[in-house]
A protein has these predicted regions:
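Bacterial N-terminal signal peptides that target proteins for export
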Residues: 1-9
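Bacterial N-terminal signal peptides
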Residues: 8-19
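Compositionally biased, proline/threonine/alanine/serine-rich low-complexity intrinsically disordered stretches
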Residues: 23-99
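Soluble extramembrane regions of membrane proteins in the secretory/endomembrane system
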Residues: 46-69, 74, 79-81, 160, ...
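Short, conserved catalytic-motif segment at the N-terminal edge
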Residues: 96-157, 179-181, 192-195, 232, ...
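Active-site SXXK
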Residues: 105-111, 125, 131, 157-183, ...
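Short, surface-exposed loop or secondary-structure junction motifs
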Residues: 139-143, 198-427, 453
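Peripheral terminal and inter-domain segments
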Residues: 445-720
């Protein structure tokens, strides 16, 4: 989740106004792979912000899409030569290999279009098939000042959560060797100081729960997952001790993506092997596989307790990360992730990732070197639990992808604040696709390229949009409602972000289509099969939704990616409820303070109790207004996710939370005073009935707002 509160507020307004379907009835694009998880607390990466294009200075911002470094044969840009059509309608049969020239022309068109549209500084791509590198190419710039082009053989991109796949390979090697059991409690393989606490749950978290992301942890990241100031960097041991997430459900219940869980897996492997994690990965995977331009280490000065730095020859070739602004590309500081290295600290080149995909497609063997055995190879192609048709599962840590044409693959997506990457291998095509971008707006390209390649060459054409269903219109109430994702923080200030951005509103429109709306936008779906089964497919692609039904009503649903479950949520967790109460509270508070100056004091009478109650309510009004203003100031700075991630929670949000806490506490006092307020009704020196009614309504409004803020974690400034 890119935590832009602008997007959050836009989502809330959308929820308040009602769901609006996107214009998906246009000519359908090639079906993209569902957006994958990123190593920070986002449920999904938010949509690309719409920003005006800016003129580029010649030396500082060269047009990234205009330059490419390639090892594949050149072809006319944007021209895809015609291929014969197979009986299925696909351009190639499964046994046929991709023509390099046609593939390069197609990828060139997709990448350069995305770079121009989304303002991406640099992209690196590699495609392998049947043991050969079919395409290896760099586009744009790894650095804009000084200018340095992307070299697919030398330029390292941060691959984010793709790092986890190396962790799962290391873990499966220990399982194959018999030193770790997949069904054993994780605590057996952790030092006592890092062992998972019960926290009220009797069932222990097992190794397999880490591999399918079902340990039952909440997901927290703000203020600690990334670090830009190396002086604040901690060892992995220290990080895992200090940033323990709460256990919010029993292990094995549902998959809910967990960076902390992946880090525990890496720590377990390190503890059992007796080697530091970075060295273990180098000795057991990277060096034997010939991946000499890949590293989990990071550039930094020597520091006690921190793994050694990345070799200088590699550090000099790491790409810069960028953010697009109206004035041009803005370079990001280096993102340190070494404290949770198994979850996301790897950097690699397109060439090395090509070797890695060949390793995965060849069952753990490359150039005669066996990195992992047949047991692990089979595990990475076998889902750990059954999922509904079209919903991705977990293949012992690897993501199972549903691709166009009914094909499946496995791999992983990844992202940092600036880098967006994806790697997908498709065994029945002998195909692997890797792509990484160095700008925060590169998510659409990264998540969609592999699916576009498969769809372009190996899937028959489809007719879109799919028509709606009259039966769905009749059963709309069974599905409509507000659903909240399980991948979020459950307490404290960080829960604000999860509640504000992690929900989805489900409606049925007049054309018999299911419409899902969240802060990323809206999508439309139609039933696939019997409505009682709760399966839906996109009106314009191959993406699926699967609802869990009970007593004829939807209880929850899973998106195509399957990294979390969306459960029906009460109205108090709906952002529209919080927004409505916030507006009403602001109006009431302003009216209360205005009343101090507008009332005619010569005609105003009140009892001592009413005088004290009025004073308390005036203080409350000032606190509520201060809280709302400070929250607005905090929100105004969140257009850049770095401000949220590195500056969490920040003084504005902290003071706003403290004001809300005091105001909520004073609400208890005014509630207790309500009976005494009304008992003074017949005295001359008492409030009028209208004044008493206004006071009472305001008390009840403040009380409702305080209760909702408690559910949202706003009343705990100490737990940022």
């Amino acid at each position: 989740m890119r935590l832009t509160i602008k997007a959050v507020l836009a989502a809330v307004l959308t929820l308040c106004a009602g769901s609006v379907a996107l214009a998906q009835d246009q000519a359908a694009p090639a079906a993209p792979i569902p957006a994958g998880p990123v190593p920070y607390t986002s449920l999904e990466r938010p949509a690309r912000p719409v920003r005006p294009a800016a003129p580029r200075p010649a030396a500082i911002r060269p047009a990234p899409a205009a330059t490419a470094t390639s090892t594949a044969p050149t072809a006319p840009i944007g021209v895809v030569p015609a291929l014969p059509v197979t009986p299925s309608g696909a351009r190639l049969a499964p046994a046929e290999t991709l023509p390099p020239a046609e593939l390069e022309a197609f990828v060139d068109g997709v990448v350069r279009s995305a770079m121009a549209r989304d303002h991406i500084a640099g992209v690196t791509v590699s495609v392998v098939q049947n043991g050969q590198v079919v395409l290896k190419k760099g586009y744009g710039f790894a650095s804009l000042n000084p200018a340095r082009k992307v070299d697919p053989d030398a330029t390292l991109f941060r691959v984010g959560s793709i790092s986890k796949t190396f962790t799962w390979i290391a873990l499966m090697k220990e399982i194959e060797a018999g030193r770790i059991r997949k069904d054993a409690p994780v605590n057996l393989y952790l030092p006592e100081r890092l062992q998972i606490r019960d926290q009220g749950f009797r069932t222990p978290v097992r190794i397999v729960n880490l591999m399918d992301h079902s340990p039952g942890f909440e997901d927290r990241a703000l203020g600690h997952l990334f670090e830009r100031n190396f002086a604040r960097e901690r060892s992995m041991d220290e990080y895992l001790r200090q940033e323990r997430p709460r256990r919010v459900r029993a292990p094995g219940e549902v998959a809910s993506y967990s960076n902390y869980g992946a880090a525990l897996a890496g720590e377990a492997v390190s503890y059992v092997s007796g080697k530091p994690f970075e060295r273990l990965i180098e000795e057991s995977i990277l060096l034997p596989a010939g991946m000499r331009n890949t590293s989990f280490r990071e550039p930094h000065e020597p520091k006690s307790g921190i793994p050694g730095a990345i070799p200088r020859r590699l550090a000099a070739n790491i790409s810069e990360g960028y953010r697009w602004t109206p004035s041009g590309f803005e370079a990001r500081p280096f993102e340190h992730i070494g404290h949770i290295a198994p979850a996301g600290s790897a950097s690699s080149t397109a060439a090395d990732m090509a070797r890695y995909m060949q390793l995965l497609l060849n069952g753990g063997v490359i150039d005669g070197a066996t990195i992992y055995g047949p047991g692990a190879a089979q595990a990475f192609r076998t889902p750990l639990r059954k999922t509904p048709a079209g919903i991705s599962g977990w293949r012992h840590g690897f993501i199972e992808y549903s691709l166009p044409g009914g094909r499946t693959g496995f791999g992983h997506a990844g992202g940092t604040l600036s880098f967006l990457s994806n790697m997908v291998v498709v065994p029945n095509l002998g195909l692997g696709v890797f792509v990484s971008t160095n700008t925060e707006t590169g998510g659409d390209l990264a998540m969609g390229l592999a699916g576009q390649v498969v769809g372009q060459f190996y899937a028959p054409p489809q007719a879109y949009p799919r028509p709606g269903s009259e039966a769905l219109k009749d059963q709309a109430r069974a599905f409509e409602g507000y659903y909240l994702g399980t991948r979020r923080a459950y307490r404290g200030l960080e829960s604000i972000v999860g509640l504000a951005t992690g929900g989805t509103t489900v409606k049925v429109d007049g054309r018999g289509r299911l419409v899902t709306t969240n802060f990323l936008g809206a999508k439309t779906w139609v039933p696939e099969g019997d409505l009682a089964e709760g399966r839906f497919i996109s009106t314009t692609g191959s993406e699926h939704l699967a609802f869990k039904m009970g007593d004829g009503r939807a209880k929850s649903f899973q998106g195509a990616f399957g990294d979390q479950t969306f459960e029906r949520a009460g109205f108090w967790k709906n952002p529209s409820t919080a927004m409505t109460l916030a507006i009403l509270t602001g109006v009431a508070a302003a009216a209360t303070l205005a009343g101090i100056f507008l009332r005619n004091r010569r005609e105003f009478r009140e009892t001592p109790v009413q005088s004290r109650a009025s004073l308390i309510q005036n203080i409350q009004a000032a606190l509520w207004l201060t809280m709302l203003i400070l929250f607005g100031l905090w929100a105004s700075r969140t257009g850049d996710i770095a401000n949220v991630m590195y500056g969490w929670p920040g003084p504005f949000l902290f003071i706003a939370s403290a004001c809300a806490l005091v105001a909520a506490a004073l609400t208890l006092a005014t509630l207790l005073l309500l009976p005494a307020i009304w008992r003074g009704g017949r005295r001359v020196d008492s409030w009028t009935p209208l004044r008493k009614l206004a006071f009472s309504v305001t008390v009840l409004l403040y009380s409702a707002f305080a209760v909702v803020l408690w559910f949202w974690g706003v009343l705990s400034p100490w737990s940022g």
